[in-house]
Regions:
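SAM/dcSAM-binding transferase cores
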Residues: 1-11, 202-301
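Class I SAM-dependent transferase core
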Residues: 1-111, 120, 127, 143-145, ...
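Generic hydrophobic alpha-helical segments
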Residues: 36-37, 195, 227
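Alpha-helix boundary/capping detector
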Residues: 37, 41-42, 56-57, 124-125, ...
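Residue-level detector of alpha-helical recognition elements and their boundaries
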Residues: 44-45, 113, 203, 247
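Short, intrinsically disordered/low-complexity patches at protein termini
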Residues: 51-52, 134, 252-255
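Hydrophobic transmembrane alpha-helix bundles
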Residues: 61-66, 79-81, 150-153, 197-203, ...
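Conserved nucleotide-cofactor-binding alpha/beta core module
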Residues: 87-214, 218-223
Length: 301
């Protein structure tokens, strides 16, 4: 019979190949962090990633299988945190792909918005190490309290309870946003250090589920005062209501349905008139296909 340690090692390799991970430190973190510690007492309710995708888009109800064996948690599955509200500890493979895109390094300062109960925040913390620091933010009071308790063993990790979009995380090397937005929050761009990476879901609202959006995970990197952008993965996710502009929903839906958003190369913050390269244009922010070198310089903070 496999021990928990065996299961964690196998799980880390499963996630590695599922998400095509390039970071040995991230793979090791998946093998070290005990998932069961973060999920509350058994029985745990386990669901498949496919069921989760259909559930969050309103196509079908979520189905769970109960288990009391912690070894069952070490697969690429979601685990219910609040069945009534359809809140889960997310799919390990998807989160791994997003965290991998952060290009975390030892000593980095990271911000995780929508940290849930802190499991993936702990994985980030393992990668940056005690020489770095991590701030998690969670709007759900109960989950935030659980995250703070779960992460108390990491002295370099703190948890903010409340709307993460209204919270100033300070200067960061890496930010992971776990809630759908129509655009990058200006403060997040300002707080990125030179070379800093922001990974976030840019989504359009789904008509059957007004609190859920579908779109892309994008990676934004600050280099030379400009913000470079690239596609990471498709996504369906709960929305961050405070970083959604109703005026951007229509152009965003057009850019997504035409697949033009996959060609995004920069986030422009310089004043300019709408142009053919503008995918989603707003005052002070533009998702653009223009090369970053052709955009105006962002002011460092």
């Amino acid at each position: 019979m496999m021990t928990l340690e065996d299961c964690r090692s196998f799980y880390a390799q499963e996630v590695r190949w599922t998400a095509n991970l390039s970071s040995p430190a991230l793979i090791d973190a998946y093998a070290r962090v005990p998932r069961e510690k973060y999920l509350g007492p058994p029985p745990w309710q386990i669901g498949s990633a496919d069921d989760r995708a259909m559930s969050i888009s309103g196509m079908a109800d979520m189905n769970y299988i109960p288990t009391e064996d912690p070894r069952d948690l070490y697969h690429n599955v979601v685990v219910a945190l609040d069945v009534a509200q359809n809140i889960n500890n997310g799919q390990p493979g998807a989160l791994a792909r997003w965290i991998n895109a952060l290009d975390l390094r030892a000593g980095d300062r990271a911000y995780h918005l929508g940290c849930g109960v802190g499991y993936y925040t702990a994985i980030i913390a393992e990668v940056v190490g005690a020489g770095g620091s991590v701030v998690g933010s969670e709007a759900h009071p109960g989950l935030a309290a659980r995250a703070a308790e779960n992460l108390s063993g990491y002295p370099y990790v703190s948890v903010h309870a409340g709307d993460g979009a209204q919270f100033d995380p300070g200067a960061c090397d890496a930010m992971l946003v776990n809630a759908g937005v129509t655009h990058p929050h200006p403060l997040w761009l300002e707080r990125l250090r030179e070379g800093g990476r922001l990974v976030l879901p840019i989504t359009m609202t789904l008509a059957p589920m007004p609190t859920v959006g579908a779109g892309i995970m994008a990676k934004i990197t600050r280099r030379g005062g400009a913000f470079w952008a690239e596609f990471v993965s498709p996504v369906a996710i709960f929305s961050c209501s405070s970083v959604r502009d109703p005026q951007l929903e229509a152009p965003l839906a057009k850019a997504l349905s035409s697949r033009a958003l996959l060609k995004m190369k920069s986030v422009r913050v310089d004043p300019h008139e709408p142009a053919d390269t503008c995918l989603v244009h707003a005052s002070g922010m533009c998702l653009s296909t223009a090369e970053p070198a052709a955009t105006g310089q962002a002011k460092a903070t």
